[in-house]
Every structure is written in structure tokens, then in C-alpha cells.
């Protein structure tokens, strides 16, 4: 899976799954621009990417920030070949207790930017008649989870968006897919106590949490020439927790 000469943009690349994706794309030969919400986070991305890319500060909820970031990338690197929409947050609460801000924050961060970022890179991809858009979803978007109606709705929306956009752009050589992780070893899961961890693993036939690099491998495959005939799909990477 050689990605030499490709320009990749990965949102939310400062740590966890996003960082693993950015690092593996670099290993496969791509030049990677990773984004973070702060200048400090962007600097950290630049440090780990080295001469193979750079970090930029991006607020995915702000239209002007998106436009400015994409202009910088186009001016310095050229048109984007691979977009990985990874940035996201959680605001968990039971529906009866959920505040409007908790709902809106999730939709505005986890769903709306998928539309804005994808639309922003699409013209360049269609002009080249080639492109890859990979959206990072979640197992919660298909199976649901108590306390996450906002998050589940957003991630289910990502899947619907992916399928619809894929139908619109397939004839132009652009593929659009979703990778849906299950429970992955991240800073958030490392904070679980033993009982919480055991309860989580009881639902995973593989008997372990996933590694961020396993998600990255799925993303990089979908970004590769070998995946040119795959579009509109959701690739579940969850250790058997949810089987379609």
C-alpha cells in the first residue's frame, strides 16, 4: 500500500487514533498534515511528523478556520488527496438529563464538520478524478449505547452521510468510507478502573481492547489504491463486539 506523493489531511491528530493514523500514513509514504485544536497541539504534531508533514491549528466547528487551514495546505502542499475526518468529542449523559448544549456540541463537532471538510476538499479531488475520504465513526453509531444518544446520533449520521456522498462522487474516482472503531486503548480507556475494564471486555469476544494502530491500518487500507473499488462502506474494527 504505497502512498508516495499523496497529500493527506488528518483532523484530531495530536494523540490516540488520530496520531496513529497520521504516523502510519507517513510510513506508507504520504505527506501528512495533522490538525489539533490548539497551537501547542499543532506544534506537537509537527514534532512527531518531522520532515514528513506538519501540524496546524484547526477549529473544525468554525467555517473561517476551515477555509484558512485548507488555503494554507493548498498553497504549501497542493490539493489534498486523502482526507481523514477523525476529530471528535464526547458529552455523555442520560437523555432525561441531557442539556441542549451537550447535544449541540456533539452534533456541531462530530457531524457537521464532516460535511464541511468533505465539501471543502471535494472540488480538488473531482478535478483530479481521484480522492479518498475516510470518516472515523464508532460502533456506537450502529448498536447504540445508553448515555450517548447525542454521540450515537452523530456517528449514525456519519454513516448515512458516507453512503450518500459515496453515491454522488463514485463516478469521479473519489471513494468515501467509514471506519467504525469499537473499544480502543486510548487515554480515556486507560482511566477505567478494573471493574469498568472487566465490564467493557465482557462484551468483546476478542477479549481485549483494540490498539489505535489497528484502526490506522483500516484507514490506510481504505486510502490506498488497493481499495479503489470500495466505497460507501463501513469497516467495523471492534474485536467482534458488534457483527453486522
From Swiss-Prot:
Top-level enzyme category: oxidoreductase
Active site, UniProt feature: 151 (proton acceptor)
UniProt keyword Transcription, yes or no: no
Entry binding sites for substrate: 138
An MF annotation (GO) of this entry: 3-oxoacyl-[acyl-carrier-protein] reductase (NADPH) activity
GO annotation terms (biological process): fatty acid elongation
Catalytic activity, as annotated: a (3R)-hydroxyacyl-[ACP] + NADP(+) = a 3-oxoacyl-[ACP] + NADPH + H(+)
Residue positions binding NADP(+): 12-15, 37, 59-60, 86, 151-155, 184
Function in brief: Catalyzes the NADPH-dependent reduction of beta-ketoacyl-ACP substrates to beta-hydroxyacyl-ACP products, the first reductive step in the elongation cycle of fatty acid biosynthesis.
Name of protein: 3-oxoacyl-[acyl-carrier-protein] reductase FabG
